[in-house]
């Protein structure tokens, strides 16, 4: 039986890097747990106030992605890159 990553068609990389959810001149810290070509899995302290579309900044600005929320669960957010 194929694994979940095989079914998804894209390898997800466990990266555990600090990130910032940036929107409307504000920023919320997050942990980027997994990332792949089309999206990422984020962990946050609280989802309160996080909009459905935002910019994700990783590694102090070395990586930047416009993204939108695909799913939310407790402290985790799944996003797709635009």
Residue spans for each PLM region:
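Structured alpha-helical
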Residues: 1-82
């Amino acid at each position: 039986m194929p694994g979940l990553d095989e079914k998804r068609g894209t390898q997800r990389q466990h990266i555990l890097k600090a990130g910032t959810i940036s929107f409307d001149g504000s920023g919320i810290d997050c942990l980027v747990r997994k990332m792949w070509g089309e999206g990422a899995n984020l962990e946050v302290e609280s989802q309160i106030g996080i909009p459905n579309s935002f910019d994700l900044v990783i590694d102090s600005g070395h990586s930047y992605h416009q993204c939108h929320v695909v799913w939310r669960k407790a402290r985790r957010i799944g996003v797709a890159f635009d």
